[in-house]
């Protein structure tokens, strides 16, 4: 049995992707519609939302327009999510070489990361 300690972690692109997913879902916007507004395929946008690909500044600007909010607000929510995750002991690591540089790191994604995003969005509205 493996007794090596495991840490929970995530990447900033995964946080931004989850923020974009949550904001899109709040607006009941299908992923394909946001992808079209940004000018990428749904498959490419899915990789951005899942954190497998970093969003470019141009794509962030277009997504923000489609979501009717400034890009800075999206990044502010991502920054708040990063703070909340860090407070809870989640390590934020660089996406490049994440598994080589951080053996034993268990990356948060999906619902686990979504909890921090939801909290950050609620906090940004207060």
What are these regions (language model features)?
Residues 1-26:
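A short, Lys/Arg-rich alpha-helix, primarily the initiator
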Residues 77-117, 121:
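Short, charged recognition helix plus adjacent turn
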Residues 50:
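Short, conserved catalytic or interaction motifs in soluble domains
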Residues 22-47:
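Short alpha-helical DNA-recognition segment
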Residues 19, 30, 56-59:
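Residues that mark the N-terminal boundary/hinge immediately upstream of a DNA-recognition element
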Residues 56-73:
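DNA major-groove recognition helix of helix-turn-helix/homeodomain DNA-binding modules
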């Amino acid at each position: 049995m493996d007794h090596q300690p495991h840490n929970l972690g995530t990447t900033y692109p995964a946080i931004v992707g989850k923020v974009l997913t949550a904001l899109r879902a709040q607006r009941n916007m299908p992923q394909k519609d946001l992808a079209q507004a940004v000018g990428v395929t749904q498959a490419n946008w899915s990789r951005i939302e899942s954190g497998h690909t970093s969003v470019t500044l141009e794509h962030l600007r277009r997504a923000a327009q489609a979501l009717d909010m400034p890009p800075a607000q999206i990044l502010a929510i991502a920054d708040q999510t990063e703070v909340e995750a860090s407070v809870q002991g989640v390590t934020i690591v660089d996406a490049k070489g994440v598994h080589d540089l951080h053996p034993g790191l268990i990356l948060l994604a999906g619902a686990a990361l979504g909890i921090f995003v939801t909290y950050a969005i609620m906090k940004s509205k207060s």
